[in-house]
Amino acid sequence: METTQYGHLLIDGFGVSLRKRRGRILILSKGEKKEIPMKSVKEVVIIGKAALSSELLKALAQSGTDLLIATPTGRPVARLIPAKAGGTARNRYEQYKSLEDRRGIEIARAVIVGKIRNQASNLSYYSKARRMDEELSSELYDAAQQLKREMEELKNEEFPDIDEARKRIMARESKCANIYWEKIASIMEEWKFRGREKRTDLEGNVIDPVNLCLNVCYNLLSAQIWKNVLRFGLDPFLGYLHVERPGRISLVYDLMEPFRPMVDRFVFSYLRGMSPSLFSSNIVSGTIASLRSRFFSDFMNWRLDYKGRKLGMETIMFLYVRDIVSFLRGGKEPTMPYIPW
């Protein structure tokens, strides 16, 4: 268990019990006790097996402290939603109405433009870092330029309705993803990375380290976007790009798109200097536990320029979703987060 600088209390173990004690969170684990002031905790993340008292649950809800329950691979399972959840009914009403006008199309376009821009930035970053290998550096640079051209075309493309927009935007996103991951594979050869695989786990004899790390961090990213979607009273199940399915948080998957390349760079940095042997079946759980911890301590505190200010990722995500809501309510188009190269 640990508490990050921003206030994430990460419970990543077994046999842990959490209770409320006079404005503090009492943590009992393996005969040891630890108390943390509740006011210093902004989110409790339960990844291991833990028991929480009903009094603590009530206190978390009343104080507005977020509670996330996730699997070992970071996939969000549940969140605590207080009766006094944030946002207004109008936010959700405007979200529903936006599927019938240009607002839905522009949000769908904006999040994928933001994603492609950040993918191009990553390729430019790795091209610069590999200048000693002129051929590889040139290939990465050319691919980045190709993504930028695709991005500009998407910016200017016209769509008659949201259904046509969804189909054509996702087709372009898929094309750009193929270009991007082919070049990423060329710089991750030592890890035997061949491309994206969305389904990986911690079981079995053959573990794909890169895809496993990406999927864990994408899952944790989705949980953070989900948190902010709920804060503003939006419907997480109604998206603009991802097809609706029962239980699928489609809007969350839409809005996390610009952040995915940021997660990519974080994961590749995490793997730098590590050995693939750390992902052998008998010790991989410990390696992934370290990654989960680093996601909250490092990635969520990563500072980037956003709308003229240098802000932490936690704050950027909040302001980004607030921008989406403002646009739905008649404001200017939202600013997409950007990672410089």
Swiss-Prot record:
Family: Belongs to the CRISPR-associated endonuclease Cas1 family.
Protein's UniProt keywords contain Magnesium: yes
Function: CRISPR (clustered regularly interspaced short palindromic repeat), is an adaptive immune system that provides protection against mobile genetic elements (viruses, transposable elements and conjugative plasmids). CRISPR clusters contain spacers, sequences complementary to antecedent mobile elements, and target invading nucleic acids. CRISPR clusters are transcribed and processed into CRISPR RNA (crRNA). Acts as a dsDNA endonuclease. Involved in the integration of spacer DNA into the CRISPR cassette.
Binding site for Mn(2+): E173, H242, E257
Transmembrane stretches, start-end: none
Official protein name in the record: CRISPR-associated endonuclease Cas1
First-tier enzyme category under EC: hydrolase
Keywords of the record: Antiviral defense, DNA-binding, Endonuclease, Hydrolase, Magnesium, Manganese, Metal-binding, Nuclease
EC number(s) given by UniProt: 3.1.-.-
Highest taxon of the lineage: Archaea
A biological process from GO: maintenance of CRISPR repeat elements
Cofactors demanded by this protein: Mg(2+); Mn(2+)
Subunit: Homodimer, forms a heterotetramer with a Cas2 homodimer.
Gene that encodes the chain: cas1
Keyword Metal-binding appears in the UniProt entry: yes
InterPro entries linked to this entry: Cas1 (IPR050646), CRISPR-assoc_Cas1 (IPR002729), CRISPR-assoc_Cas1_C (IPR042206), CRISPR-assoc_Cas1_N (IPR042211)
Molecular-function GO term, any one: endonuclease activity
